[in-house]
């Protein structure tokens, strides 16, 4: 097993003249959601046993065939999680309504024919829902389709996953859809439509008395045809306030080959105050930036 995740395996592994021959089936005997939770990076610590949890899971699959320099065994791996929940005992909010359905499959001897199906993925961080789905048909032309939607309240989120010495607040709404083929060589992208809105943002470091406040941003990313040329990233507004000093701006980038941009930034910021909130090791910045900039151009 791995961490607290145990599984049974039966079958054989043989060594013919060429390669390795596999005929293995595996399944998890324990349907407790907490066992698969132990695989999440950072979760399996000394305090893991004290985490409250509920929900069920199933895990099963097989690997069958010859592994050589030019071929792989066929395989089918399935994971399902139903109504999962976990909560740290010292924190007020759980992560619950975790539902996942995932299958990774290859019925051939070629790795490029591997498919990934995630028709269901959803969870609630307290009262903050996230849901989505994803399909990748193969690793050859990377034909894919997916969607991700969510609403996050950062103050509530940090009551589940606290960040020592830092206070956060703000509301994040996002939605994203992608469908099509990805080919980096020929600069082909899936058709993409994504929207992002962040409002009432707040960041405060315990070692500095002032907070970064009124953080806001509205952005969209779009590529209707799935090409670099029609890719548009539009940050229609962004800004923040620090001890009465404001920064406001916008930026639009179109055509990721030509990198045509149009943007503006106006306001003032004290670099020493910013570094106090977001410290960078072995780095010291001082000075005040005052700006009223409009810029248009291409790379």
Where in the sequence are the language-model features?
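Short solvent-exposed strand-capping/beta-turn motif centered on an Asx-Ser/Thr pair
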Residues: 66-68, 183, 298
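Disulfide-stabilized extracellular beta-strand modules
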Residues: 190-192
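Short glycine/proline/serine/threonine-rich loop/turn segments at secondary-structure transition edges
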Residues: 70-71, 187-188
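Interface amphipathic segments
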Residues: 1-60, 86-177, 187, 203-296
């Amino acid at each position: 097993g791995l961490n607290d995740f145990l599984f049974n395996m039966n079958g054989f592994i043989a060594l013919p003249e060429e390669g390795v021959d596999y005929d293995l089936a595996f399944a998890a005997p324990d349907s407790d959601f907490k066992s698969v939770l132990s695989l999440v990076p950072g979760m399996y610590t000394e305090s893991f046993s004290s985490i409250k949890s509920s929900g069920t899971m199933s895990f099963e699959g097989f690997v069958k065939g010859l592994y050589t320099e030019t071929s792989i065994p066929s395989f089918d791996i399935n994971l399902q999680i139903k109504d999962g929940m976990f909560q740290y005992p010292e924190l007020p909010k759980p992560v619950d309504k975790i539902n996942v359905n995932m299958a990774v499959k290859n019925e051939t001897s070629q790795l490029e024919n591997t498919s990934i199906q995630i028709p269901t993925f959803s969870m609630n961080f307290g009262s903050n829902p996230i849901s989505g789905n994803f399909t990748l048909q193969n690793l050859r032309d990377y034909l894919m389709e997916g969607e991700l939607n969510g609403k996050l309240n950062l103050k509530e989120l940090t009551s589940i996953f606290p960040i020592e010495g830092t206070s956060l607040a703000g509301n994040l709404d996002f939605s994203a859809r992608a469908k099509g083929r990805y080919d980096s060589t020929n600069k082909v992208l899936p058709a993409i439509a994504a929207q992002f809105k962040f409002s009432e943002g707040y960041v405060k470091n315990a070692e500095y008395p002032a907070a970064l406040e009124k953080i806001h941003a509205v952005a969209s990313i779009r590529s209707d045809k799935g090409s670099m040329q029609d890719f548009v990233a539009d940050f229609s507004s962004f800004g923040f306030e620090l001890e009465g000093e404001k920064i406001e701006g916008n930026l639009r980038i179109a055509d990721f080959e030509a990198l045509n941009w149009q943007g503006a930034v106006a306001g003032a910021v004290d670099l020493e105050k910013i570094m106090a909130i977001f410290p960078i090791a072995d780095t010291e910045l001082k000075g005040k930036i005052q700006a009223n900039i409009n810029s248009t151009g291409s790379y």
